[in-house]
Each structure stands twice: as C-alpha cells, then as structure tokens.
Amino acid sequence: LMEMLGDGAPRSAHADLNRRLRFSWHHLSHAASAFYPSPFTEAAVLTLDGVGEWATASLHLGQGKKLNLIREIRFPHSLGLLYSAFTAYCGFKVNSGEYKLMGLAPYGEAKYADLIRKHLVHIADDGSFALGLDYFGFETGSRMTNSAFHRLFAGEARELRRQFAEVSE
C-alpha cells in the first residue's frame, strides 16, 4: 500500500501502517463505545445486533475501565435478524430497509403482537430469548423467512410495487 501511495501518503498514514493490527470483538466494541464515554463509573451494558462473530446479544458489566461479559446469546437467535426477517417480508431490502419499516411502524396496529410472542420469540424468565426457528430460513438458506412464516402471516413475502419502490429508495 505504501508503494502505491508513494510520497502522496500523509506521514501519519505511514506510521499507522507500521503498527500492529488488533482485533476486537464486535459486541465488546459496541459496549465499549457506549460505556467508556458515558458519565457512569458502573453500568449494565446491553448490546443487540443482527450478528457479530457468533453473538447476537450481550450483557456486560462496566466497572471503571473494565467491561466484563455476563451473558451472551448466539446465532441463530437474534432480535436483529427477526427485525430483518420482517423487513424482507414487507418487501424492503435486508440491512438497508429496516429504518423504513421502523418509520412506518407508528402508523400500523399491533394486531400480530400475540402471534409473534406465541410463535416467533420465546422469552425466558431470566429475560433471555430464543427464536422459533421453524419459521425462518436464514439459518440454513438464503431467505430470511420460509413457508411456515408465510402461513403464519397468511401470505407470501411482499414485493414493493415499482412506484412505491422508487419512493422508498
């Protein structure tokens, strides 16, 4: 890279390229970016994501300069992937259209909440969760949802009609 950049590279870039690369765990990075700049010296730090390495949710205890992992939930059980499944089912692109679905949510009705709690998300007494994997395709295939999910919600995944897709892009 330094050969390609030649003298056009800033001196700081040359110095950075000679340093050792360090790996950081995905959820620990999220927890650190929330806890360390906060005004708290002690806090419970909860992170939720689609998936990072294998963790999809983590609970850390932040104390001073330390973050200690208390508990984590691993793939395929993921609230982020659950949300992405609904994003795809409603006709939006996964990892791109979630904010659109979130923006539309206040205009809908919670008529499927009981169905979701009964079949899709099982919440344990300790607050942990597990997905009803029989309804999803992301664990073993390339689709977020499967035919059982479609039967549960009485229809195939939606495709945005052209005129709506143009507005939503």
Predicted regions and their residues:
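Short acidic/glycine-rich loops and adjacent helix/strand connectors
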Residues: 1-169
